[in-house]
Amino acid sequence: MSNIEDRVRKIIIEQLGVDEAEVKNEASFVDDLGADSLDTVELVMALEEEFDTEIPDEAAEKITTVQAAIDYVNSASE
């Protein structure tokens, strides 16, 4: 999985224990995928590790959907 979008989706599936079909771009981690605040912190940490980047708290608070995570990683890797 070299594609950023695929890698982000894989992390979300593993961290939240959700089915691949549920991980749509517009899906909210909390409202659609059942994540709680601890899940979202762990998700951000997993993204940081996978993409070897640091996500500041103010940016992490804005990463609330699958697409937001993909967009952030894309912009951080440019």
From Swiss-Prot:
Where are the bilayer-spanning segments? none
Q: Which GO terms describe its cellular component?
A: cytosol; membrane
Pathway the protein takes part in: Lipid metabolism; fatty acid biosynthesis
Keywords attached to this Swiss-Prot or TrEMBL record, sorted alphabetically, are: Cytoplasm, Fatty acid biosynthesis, Fatty acid metabolism, Lipid biosynthesis, Lipid metabolism, Phosphopantetheine, Phosphoprotein
Q: Which GO terms describe its molecular function?
A: acyl binding; acyl carrier activity
- Recount the PTM note: 4'-phosphopantetheine is transferred from CoA to a specific serine of apo-ACP by AcpS. This modification is essential for activity because fatty acids are bound in thioester linkage to the sulfhydryl of the prosthetic group.
Which SUPFAM superfamilies does the record cross-reference, listed alphabetically?
Answer: ACP-like
Kindly give the Pfam families that the UniProt entry links to this protein: PP-binding
Per the annotation, which location comes first and is thus the protein's main one?
Answer: cytoplasm
Protein localization: Cytoplasm
| UniProt modified residues of type O-(pantetheine 4'-phosphoryl)serine | 37
The biological process GO terms on file are: lipid A biosynthetic process
- The segment(s) forming the Carrier domain are 2-77
Q: Does the keyword Phosphoprotein apply?
A: yes
Q: What HAMAP family does its record include?
A: Acyl_carrier
Q: Please give the family membership noted in the entry.
A: Belongs to the acyl carrier protein (ACP) family.
* Function according to Swiss-Prot or TrEMBL: Carrier of the growing fatty acid chain in fatty acid biosynthesis.
- State the name under which the record lists this protein: Acyl carrier protein
Can you name the source organism? Answer: Photobacterium profundum (strain SS9)
Question: By which gene is this protein encoded?
Answer: acpP
